[in-house]
Amino acid sequence: MASVFMCGVEDLLFSGSRFVWNLTVSTLRRWYTERLRACHQVLRTWCGLRDVYQMTEGRHCQVHLLDDRRLELLVQPKLLSRELLDLVASHFNLKEKEYFGITFIDDTGQENWLQLDHRVLEHDLPKKPGPTLLHFAVRFYIESISFLKDKNTVELFFLNAKACVHKGQIEVDSETIFKLAALVLQESKGDYTSDENARKDLKTLPVFPTKTLQEHPSLAYCEDRVIEHYLKIKGLTRGQAVVQYMKIVEALPTYGVHYYAVKDKQGLPWWLGISYKGIGQYDLQDKVKPRKLFQWKQLENLYFREKKFAVEVHDPRRISVSRRTFGQSGLFVQTWYANSSLIKSIWVMAISQHQFYLDRKQSKAKIPSARSLDDIAMDLTETGTQRGSKLVTLEAKSQFIMASNGSLISSGSQDSEGMEEQKREKILELKKKEKLLQEKLLQKVEELKKICLREAELTGRMPKEYPLNIGEKPPQVRRRVGTTFKLDDNLLPTEEDPALQELESNFLIQQKLVEAAKKLASEPDLCKTVKKKRKQDYTDAVKRLQEIENSINEYRIRCGKKPSQKAAVVPPEDIIPSESSSLSDTTTYDDPNDSFTLAGQRPSSVPHSPRILPPKSLGIERIHFRKSSINEQFMDTRHSREMLSTHSSPYKTLERRPQGGRSMPTTPVLTRNAYSSSHLEPDSSSQHCRQRSGSLESQSHLLSEMDSDKPFFTLSKSQRSSSTEILDDGSSYTSQSSSEYYCVTPAASPYYTTQTLDTRARGRRRSKKHSVSTSNSGSMPNLAQKDPLRNGVYSKGQDPPPSGYYIAGYPPYAECDLYYSGGYVYENDTEGQYSVNPSYRSSAHYGYDRQRDYSRSFHEDEVDRVPHNPYATLRLPRKAAVKSEHITKNIHKALVAEHLRGWYQRASGQKDQGHSPQTSFDSDRGSQRCLGFAGLQVPCSPSSRASSYSSVSSTNASGNWRTQLTIGLSEYENPVHSPYTSYYGSIYNPLSSPSRQYAETTPLDGTDGSQLEDNLEGSEQRLFWHEDSKPGTLV
């Protein structure tokens, strides 16, 4: 029993194990078969694609041409889009390739254009199996085909317009569609023959867009309307039909516009149209009439970042009256949204269209005139081949155009007949050119022979340049003397009276010498020494002429003849002025635009620096001499000759226009040695450059540190502002210290006078000032000044030098260009910026991180505010900014108090200050308590920016021009290093304001700075800059 049981168990185990084994084997076989089949499919697919991927790299592409031909080629990784365009253009013998481009449809269904400076395979080509489809089309449109030079270009424009109308890219009404279809029939098939043939041709030609067929479901109706127009244009040549077709299409509003589907901030869909005219925003159902149109001249910057495309629009109507004077504030940002790839495509298209717009503006001046449409029609009619009616398809797919290293070879895509005809045409053109060149050459050879013969007659030798044919001998020429010259009859000796004749000839010769000397003496732009010498030569020549005339008269009297009336030249007073006069080289100009630079003035060390005049707002209309008081005039009348030196002054001081109704004291006269901008001539252009002579210290100004509470000014003896001392224009200050050149300016009073530093006084002050300011001595430009706020530690090397190094009206740095040099700034694939019109000066986009802290927007609206980021993508803060109303109010109180204090000091006598030699200020800067300087040190928010401007009158400085307005941060570029201590952080703005070019900064003395601090400390309003704070944030 037990054995039987064990045998059954063994049989069961054996059968079970066998079953499991068979199941495993069958499963493995099934799995192996399936996997083997999959491997076979993979191998079969790989072997099937080996024809396409013959090389390990490359992509099979198919270019659809405008004449319905297809060009197949293998694009290598190194092939540029420009080379591919050249290859395609060679199949049309196209010369004007700048209007065309190659486009493709990406995976999202959006049309993209190949960028010519990129490689073809670097673009986001569709990843679908099979060859990549590319389309050759017109990318840049023009106003009329009359501006096209080549007939092949005109024909391609016609084919492109016909394709765009058929695809619906150009919206056309039904009646216009029927007219265009009739013109296409006339162009391709010729004159009307029968309705049956016309209907048959209309079914094969692409003339009806889908929209027209939807409006008119009856195809017979459309064909009948086309036939009606077809009968009217019977007899029209092919060229005339093409020209009429293009005239109709060019008049359509949607012609030449590239449309993109975008959304605004509210999520509403729009069409964004970009063309050579600008950027337009269209309704989704209406592509004809734009809701908004921004021309290129209105735009300033184009930005894109990820899914946002933004443009900065310059709208003068948005500039308020109060802001028109102070800066560029008529900017608002228009933004649209779409997917990232589409946004980048829009940005690239906008850049290319703007570049084409600029190129068109420049090329219009070069093109003499547009071609006549009749001539274009004749050229198109004479063309034997009708490429629009030919459909050529390459069936042999094994033939490719290999273009990897720039070698572009085409095969099998050009008609032999067309090539032969083009060759014949080119040969004829070359023969015509050869004939014209030969005719011109013969004409020039004859002219050269004549010139050589005339030279041989004068010199007696035949020149080597005389053209000779092979075997030809040069002609024999005799030298002819006197044949081309005519002597004066008076110079020829006569037998009547040789002595008198000699005197007469000497008189004529001397008269010619006098005329020559007069011309030399009256030449402009001469230095004083040369001019004086020439004047003396002219005077001597005139005296010699007068002596000869007297000798002639005496001799005639002795001979019993009447004295002759010779026209002796008398030196006029304008050419030979009195050298003893102190005003010999001065000139009075009635027109403020006249030149301020005279002959005796030394040129500036900067050869290309523009010269500037004082602005018109100053009221300077006449340049003449002015005395500060009646006593000074009286003293000048009595003792002018004792006080004046032998030199004459080439400069004059400027007169300020009197402002009626003011109780302010008279503005002092600008001294001649103040090297201010009044000696310069204005330049209407917007070019700015650094105006300095020698080193950076050559025109700096001395700031004295005083411990007293009141400022003191040194008074000098009375002296005329038109004295005859040699003036220093700053052109030779290259090795002396900056403290050697200054002018003492007393406070304004009835006894106010000015002093000009002469050579002797300059030598005395040079020894005195070495002990006062040692950091400025020498001519090294990199000497740093110590900042009292940093306990004697030198400031950063990047800090700009004081404003004394520059002439007013020029930016502190030449490299701080206010706008880009054209082109676009492209960062990466997700963001970019392009400057459209660099002429607009916006304070927000002059640079990147370097300039971002100094940019502030004047606008309060979120749409109008220009963001600080150069890509215009920073979100505006939703929370309200820190209020600075109380701060601004306290600052204004301090400024008004300072203004009143300065007025009182000018109006009152300066007896206490007049005798104190402790402090002296530069007359160019003066003691102007500049209200704008205080505003310069205060960080202004956008809300308080406009209120920081303060209207003041002229100050007591003789070198100060401003009489109307002093402005804060936007007007004063760079504060002078002042010795006072303040709670304001030092802010430096390297960008000059575009609206005011003649503003200057003025240092505050220690007293004024401390008083301003006290006023602010009383209200417990202190502003500090946090190191980690963002621009425009008050901490």
Curated annotation (Swiss-Prot):
Keywords, ordered alphabetically: Cell junction, Coiled coil, Cytoplasm, Cytoskeleton, Isopeptide bond, Phosphoprotein, Tight junction, Ubl conjugation
Coiled coil regions in record: 414-451, 535-559
Example of a GO cellular component annotation carried by this entry: adherens junction
Location in chain, cross-link Glycyl lysine isopeptide (Lys-Gly) (interchain with G-Cter in SUMO2): 883, 1030
Phosphoserine sites (modified residues): 372, 609, 698, 916
SUPFAM superfamilies reported in the protein's UniProt record: PH domain-like, Second domain of FERM, Ubiquitin-like
Keyword Phosphoprotein belongs to the record: yes
Chain positions covered by the region annotation Disordered: 563-615, 631-699, 713-738, 754-798, 906-926, 939-958, 994-1035
Annotated stretches, region: Necessary for adherens junction and tight junction localization: 542-972
Basic residues bias: start-end ranges: 762-771
Taxonomic superkingdom: Eukaryota
One Pfam family recorded for the sequence: FERM_N
Expression sites (tissue/organ): Isoform 1 is expressed in the brain. Isoform 2 is expressed in the lung (at protein level).
Compositionally skewed regions (Low complexity) per UniProt: 571-590, 941-958
Residue ranges occupied by any FERM domain in the UniProt entry: 59-361
Residue stretches of biased makeup (Basic and acidic residues): 635-644, 1019-1035
UniProt biased composition (Polar residues): 594-607, 664-699, 715-725, 772-782, 907-921
Biological role stated in the UniProt entry: Member of GRP1 signaling complexes that are acutely recruited to plasma membrane ruffles in response to insulin receptor signaling. May function as a scaffolding protein that regulates epithelial cell polarity by connecting ARF6 activation with the PAR3 complex. Plays a redundant role with FRMD4A in epithelial polarization.
Subunit structure: Interacts with CYTH3. Interacts with PARD3. Interacts with CYTH1.
Name of the protein in its database record: FERM domain-containing protein 4B
Species in which this protein is naturally found: Mus musculus (Mouse)
Organism classification: Eukaryota, Metazoa, Chordata, Craniata, Vertebrata
UniProt gene name: Frmd4b
